Amino acid sequence: MQSKRECEQWCERVNPENKAALEAWVRETGIRLVQVNGQRKYGGPPPGWVGSPPPSGSEVYIGRLPQDVYEHQLIPLFQRVGRLYEFRLMMTFSGLNRGFAYARYSSRRGAQAAIATLHNHQLRPSCQLLVCRSTEKCELTVDGLPLSLNRRALLLALQPFGPCLQETLLLPSPGSAPSQIALLKFSTHRAAAMAKKALVEGQSRLCGEQVAVEWLKPDLKQHFRQQLAGPSLRFLRPDVSQLTQTREKLGSQGARAALQLLCQRMKLGSPVFLTKCLGTGPAGWHRFWYQVVIPGHPVPFSGLIWVVLASDWQDGHEVAKDAVSAQLLEALSEPRTSLWSPGAEAGTMVKQ
């Protein structure tokens, strides 16, 4: 088994010419390169940058790199087509690159110019670069949240991530255990990666619960899009007087009666509820599929909801209808614009 010093000596012997050229270029230009978690980075932001980071779509993926190529050959090349905000070269422990890098420009136009100009660029004989739009991961899932957690409490727990957190959804977990899953959308991949690292290094606990933190998988994203695809409540937005009367009804007779009154005031007709119990969990939790048909609206509202029954004599279907009514009323009274899909709040679980 090699000692640490022997490993260091072996790494020093790998690609010495290009390493020396890189060091000379760094001294000459004064450029600052930082090694972070298996990648070497320039910028993010670069010197003299003022303002917010570039928008999504401003980063390109660079593939088919010879492993002995370094920044002194790549950064000047990619700076020719636009101003670089950040350049990241993926590295091995030996000091060779891993065959790919990422270049983020100050605008989407710079990224488009890089693709148009440098894709298939011949860096060396028989070595053509692959340059394409980077698929930036900006979305996380936090699974295993308690059923009692509401959206406001979740947002309070996520406050440390600040304005980089653009969207938060709280939905029924697709797993078999009765729990919730949060979908978090960040402004940049870097912000999402830092949030993931913080959550994982915090022993993956959020709101006092053990949770699983992962990148949002494409199939799961599609699943939620299909589940949430539905009518937007903004087309049913009531006026202030109608909401005031509805809240009075809510306090005296319950959510379903309040929703019935609101629909009548808006001349939409009486809502019709369809529910189906999909299974049960521990501590009296029941999972329901629901659909609410409002005659004056062209498309029904549907989704999943967990409810808990206070006693054996309670009718789970009636409890589910009341819970869904409360959600529809909340969505009507608190306008939201979702980056995921219209009607996203329809999946939030409640406890009765």
From Swiss-Prot:
InterPro entries: DND1_DSRM, DND1_RRM1, Nucleotide-bd_a/b_plait_sf, RBD_domain_sf, RRM_dom
UniProt keyword Ion transport present: no
Keywords attached to this entry: Cytoplasm, Developmental protein, Methylation, Nucleus, Repeat, RNA-binding
Role, per record: RNA-binding factor that positively regulates gene expression by prohibiting miRNA-mediated gene suppression. Relieves miRNA repression in germline cells. Prohibits the function of several miRNAs by blocking the accessibility of target mRNAs. Sequence-specific RNA-binding factor that binds specifically to U-rich regions (URRs) in the 3' untranslated region (3'-UTR) of several mRNAs. Does not bind to miRNAs. Isoform 1 may play a role during primordial germ cell (PGC) survival. However, does not seem to be essential for PGC migration.
Subunit: Interacts with APOBEC3.
Entry's localization field: Nucleus; Cytoplasm
Annotated disease: Defects in Dnd1 are the cause of the Ter mutation phenotype. Ter mice are characterized by primordial germ cell loss and susceptibility to spontaneous testicular germ cell tumors (TGCT). They are sterile, but viable. Isoform 1 defects may be the cause of tumor development.
Protein name: Dead end protein homolog 1
Major site of localization recorded for this protein: nucleus
Organism: Mus musculus (Mouse)
Signal peptide: none
